[in-house]
Amino acid sequence: MSKRRIAPLTFLRRLLLRILAALAVFWGGGIALFSVVPVPFSAVMAERQISAWLSGEFGYVAHSDWVSMADISPWMGLAVIAAEDQKFPEHWGFDVPAIEKALAHNERNESRIRGASTLSQQTAKNLFLWDGRSWVRKGLEAGLTLGIETVWSKKRILTVYLNIAEFGDGIFGVEAAAQRYFHKPASRLSVSEAALLAAVLPNPLRYKANAPSGYVRSRQAWIMRQMRQLGGESFMTRNQLN
């Protein structure tokens, strides 16, 4: 009897290990490949596309137009750093003090959860993982973050982030966002336009760059102040991000 009970557990354990090994090879290959090759699509884009098809929205197309950092306004990179991760050039994928503050805040305010994901973590999550909150997903995100921080330069992480970030319903990447909202290429985005796009990033399906709420305008102004405090364009040059 004991052998019959153990056998299925052994099989499941081996199956799980094989699945994890296959995922490790897949993700590791993706990290290596996308260190030099433009990213054609992300997990978030695939998830949105499949969801649209299942809902009968066959006209929905989730895609992004890849552009190099040379074709992105330096204000855009600075805006997302100012908004999302001001220690981006310094850390190895995780902002520990910010995580500690977020945990303390969430213990006091269970109804208003605060995140502390760095740009590196967001890039790993958007590129390779599914939406949702779980310890398994967080563990995978941490491993993938370490992977891209080890293999990619900070400039590459920022470039990929800007090309796969969601800026609205079906709008992925800064080039698509610049064309949709401002009718210009990403290379010509101004300070205020870059800050406005960065302002919707916490929830691009709720906040609208083409119809900004008072909160979005307030956040845009705050981001512009942070951009000045970081040192403007010189911040990007000093940290070899443009």
Curated annotation (Swiss-Prot):
Any one of the GO BP annotations: regulation of cell shape
Protein name (Swiss-Prot/TrEMBL): Biosynthetic peptidoglycan transglycosylase
Topology in membrane: Single-pass membrane protein
Source taxon at top rank: Bacteria
Listed transmembrane segments: 19-39
PANTHER family per the UniProt record, alphabetical: BIOSYNTHETIC PEPTIDOGLYCAN TRANSGLYCOSYLASE, MONOFUNCTIONAL BIOSYNTHETIC PEPTIDOGLYCAN TRANSGLYCOSYLASE
Annotated catalysed reactions: [GlcNAc-(1->4)-Mur2Ac(oyl-L-Ala-gamma-D-Glu-L-Lys-D-Ala-D-Ala)](n)-di-trans,octa-cis-undecaprenyl diphosphate + beta-D-GlcNAc-(1->4)-Mur2Ac(oyl-L-Ala-gamma-D-Glu-L-Lys-D-Ala-D-Ala)-di-trans,octa-cis-undecaprenyl diphosphate = [GlcNAc-(1->4)-Mur2Ac(oyl-L-Ala-gamma-D-Glu-L-Lys-D-Ala-D-Ala)](n+1)-di-trans,octa-cis-undecaprenyl diphosphate + di-trans,octa-cis-undecaprenyl diphosphate + H(+)
